[in-house]
Structure formats: structure tokens, C-alpha cells
């Protein structure tokens, strides 16, 4: 019965998505369709409305709109150029300096803005012209830009990790933020290894001349105010000075002060940023609300228990089960955006992982890491196609290089999956677990 209900949910969901129905409505309709065989229609609709309201009324959910607004303000604040100059001043002498600079800057910018697509667009456009002048293949720079754009989604502050906290029943946001650093850095390092190897193979050299300490000092001073946002907000949250929600509001105030000091926005552009952020936040908050319907349906029909029993009937080896889950998440991530996928798969797979002793922290990082890979993989791959568009190249030219990045990034995924300390060492050291 439970497996049949799961198949109904997936079938209806896929059909509705194929027809172009917004993901929020598709989740609600597919969930209700699956449970109508068990309870009365009126009861199902009333309960669905109540679950949606409960899901949208969680106080911790207010952190997401604030972080979205702060990220959008910073996107318009001219920080990409400052970060690129800062990283280039440090790494400019390396082989393929522009590739490595792109990777590291994407990690920093993605952490500040909270968006892989925004990082790929802003940083990629800054790198592109210099790369063209130095004879870099546009396909190589586009692949590097796209592949590294998602590392910032793992490095806090991360809306994906906040969403997972809500979906998992209140996992500590501070612990998740602390846990995200090592996987995010692993992602960036994997990309750096591939970038340097490509640079050596293709003959891309660093900037000539001696290391310029004066330029480094100037670039550091220019980038420091932007980088301080991460230090202030994350330091305050992890240190217990304020909650994630309060930290998100502080991030907005800090971003506003910085943007006005840089004179990068005015009142007219600020209003547009607020409206765009409100639209984006409305979609996310409503999505979180309707995902509560899915969680209720799965719990009512005992779908996670049935899935666990089905997997255990195949094998009792937890490592094989984790590999199967990774494959499912990787494939699903290529068709779905990160937020809805988190809300769908958390209630399905988290109980299974908890049954063999995995912490909610580690599962959260495995989940988000997988879905980030999907964000740079066709056929949907939002960040991938942004990188291709910014790089002025084509998918067919980029994919041979992307395959190299996929191998390295999936290697990082295996570390996150099979070595718990990768996700749990920092939270445990900080007393957050």
C-alpha cells in the first residue's frame, strides 16, 4: 500500500511538472491524490490546508526571506569585482590563475549571495574578458565557472541548509552551518585540482613578474568589508550571540550599509531588489508550506518505513544503501531545483539513515551536496546553463570538461558520504552536537 502510494505521488508529480504546473501545486496535488484512497476528501483538504499553514508559520522560516534579500543587495553591490581582484592578488602566479581565481571567488561569492546562478553570472562575467584576452578556451572557463558555482551553497550562510533544518524537524541551523564548511571547501578543492591540471595541460600560465604585496594590501582592504559579512553573521550564529533568524536580519542591515557606502544602489534600485526578493521569498515559503502536506502524507501512509523495508530486502549493508540513495538523489537533482528536492527527499530518506545511526547533520550535507551536483548537470542544471550563457559557448563544447569536474566532485561526495567526520567534526568541536 505504502509503496503504491509513493509511486502514485511520483507519477502524478512528474506528469504535472512535465505539463508545466508550478512545483508547489504539483507537490500538493500529488500528495492529496495518494491519500484519497485512505481518508475522506473533505478531511484530506482541511488537513492539507492546516498543514500548509503550520509549515508557513514557523518562526525560523523568516531567516530565508532575509538571507534572500541580503544576497540580492550584495549581488547589486559590486562585490564580485572586489572579490575577484582580492583572490587574483593572492593566486595570480599559479598556473591557470584565472581558473583557480574563478573557483575560489565563486565559493566566497556564493556563500555571501546564497545563489549558485548568481555566483556563476557575476563572477563568470568578471573572469570572462580577462580569460579571453589571455587566450583561454571559453569552454574551459565556462565549465570551471559552472562547476565551482555550487560550492557556495554548502558554505554558510546557506538557504539550502536552513530549508533542510525545517524539513528535518528542527536540526540546529548553527550546527548545519558549521558542518557545511568542510564539504564546501572539499568541493572547491576538487575543482581547483581539475582547474590546475587543465591549465598545465593547455599551457595556461599565471601572471608574469614578482608577487605584488602592495596590490594585495589594496585588494584586501577593498574586499574586507564584503568578507566581513560572513564573519559577523556566521560568527554571531555559531557563537550563540544571536539566532539564525536574527543573523539574517543583521545581514540585511549590513548589506544595505555596505551597498550605500559603495554607492552601488539607490532608492529606486533598492525598491526593485525588495520586490524581487519578496517574489522569490513568497515562492520558497509557500513551497515549504505545501511540503508539509507531503511530509504528513508520507508519515500517515508509513511510506519511509516501506521504503526502508524495500531497501533492506535488497541488502542489509548500509554502505550499499547509501550508494543507492546517492544515485537516486543525483538523478533526481538533474530534474529538480535544490529547495523542492530537499523538501521531498528529507522525509523519505532521513528516517532510513537514522535507523543505522547516521546523524541528521551528515545526512543533510549528503543531501545538499548531491542536489548541488544536479544543479550543474543537464537537462535542467540552472547554474550550468548560466555559466554557458555567460561564457558565450555551447553545451556540446563545455561537457567534455564538465565530465572531469563531475568525477572530482563526486569523489568529494564519497568522502562526505562515507566519512562522518567530514560533516560532524567541526560541529562537535564547537559543542553544537
Q: What would you call each of these model-derived segments?
A:
Residues 1-433:
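Alpha-helical transmembrane segments of multi-pass membrane transport proteins
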Amino acid at each position: 500500500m505504502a509503496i503504491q502510494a509513493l509511486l502514485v505521488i511520483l507519477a502524478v508529480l512528474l506528469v504535472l511538472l512535465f505539463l508545466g504546473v508550478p512545483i508547489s501545486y504539483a507537490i500538493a496535488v500529488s500528495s492529496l491524490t495518494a491519500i484519497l484512497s485512505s481518508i475522506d476528501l473533505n478531511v484530506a483538504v482541511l488537513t492539507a490546508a492546516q498543514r500548509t499553514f503550520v509549515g508557513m508559520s514557523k518562526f525560523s522560516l523568516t531567516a530565508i526571506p532575509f538571507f534572500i534579500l541580503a544576497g540580492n543587495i550584495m549581488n547589486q553591490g559590486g562585490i564580485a569585482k572586489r572579490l575577484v581582484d582580492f583572490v587574483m592578488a593572492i593566486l595570480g602566479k599559479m598556473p591557470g590563475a584565472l581558473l583557480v581565481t574563478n573557483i575560489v571567488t565563486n565559493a566566497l561569492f556564493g556563500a555571501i549571495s546564497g545563489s549558485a546562478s548568481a555566483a556563476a553570472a557575476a563572477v563568470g562575467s568578471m573572469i570572462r574578458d580577462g580569460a579571453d584576452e589571455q587566450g583561454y578556451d571559453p569552454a574551459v572557463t565556462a565549465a570551471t565557472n559552472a562547476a565551482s558555482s555550487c560550492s557556495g551553497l554548502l558554505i554558510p550562510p546557506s538557504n539550502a541548509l536552513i530549508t533542510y533544518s525545517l524539513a528535518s524537524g528542527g536540526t540546529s541551523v548553527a550546527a548545519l552551518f558549521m558542518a557545511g564548511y568542510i564539504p564546501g571547501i572539499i568541493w572547491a578543492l576538487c575543482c581547483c585540482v581539475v582547474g590546475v591540471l587543465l591549465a598545465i595541460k593547455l599551457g595556461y600560465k599565471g601572471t608574469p613578474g614578482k608577487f605584488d604585496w602592495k596590490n594585495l594590501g589594496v585588494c584586501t582592504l577593498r574586499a574586507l568589508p564584503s568578507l566581513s559579512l560572513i564573519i559577523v553573521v556566521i560568527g554571531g550564529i555559531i557563537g550563540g550571540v544571536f539566532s539564525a533568524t536574527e543573523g539574517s536580519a543583521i545581514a540585511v542591515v549590513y548589506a544595505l550599509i555596505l551597498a550605500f557606502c559603495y554607492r552601488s544602489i539607490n532608492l529606486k534600485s533598492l525598491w526593485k531588489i525588495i520586490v524581487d526578493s519578496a517574489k522569490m521569498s513568497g515562492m520558497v515559503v509557500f513551497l515549504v508550506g505545501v511540503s508539509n502536506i507531503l511530509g504528513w502524507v508520507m508519515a500517515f501512509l508509513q511510506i519511509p518505513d516501506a521504503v526502508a523495508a524495500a531497501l533492506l530486502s535488497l541488502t542489509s549493508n548500509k554502505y550499499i544503501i547509501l550508494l543507492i540513495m546517492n544515485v537516486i538523489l543525483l538523478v533526481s537533482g538533474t530534474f529538480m531545483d535544490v529547495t523542492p528536492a530537499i523538501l521531498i527527499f528529507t522525509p523519505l530518506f532521513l528516517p532510513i539513515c537514522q535507523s543505522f545511526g547516521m546523524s541528521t547533520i551528515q545526512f543533510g550535507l549528503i543531501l545538499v551536496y548531491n542536489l548541488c551536483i544536479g544543479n550543474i548537470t543537464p537537462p535542467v542544471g540552472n547554474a550550468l546553463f548560466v555559466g554557458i550563457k555567460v561564457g558565450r559557448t555551447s553545451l556540446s563544447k563545455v561537457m567534455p570538461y564538465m565530465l572531469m569536474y563531475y568525477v572530482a566532485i563526486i569523489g568529494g561526495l564519497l568522502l562526505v558520504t562515507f566519512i562522518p567526520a567530514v560533516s560532524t567534526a567541526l560541529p562537535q568541536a564547537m559543542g553544537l552536537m
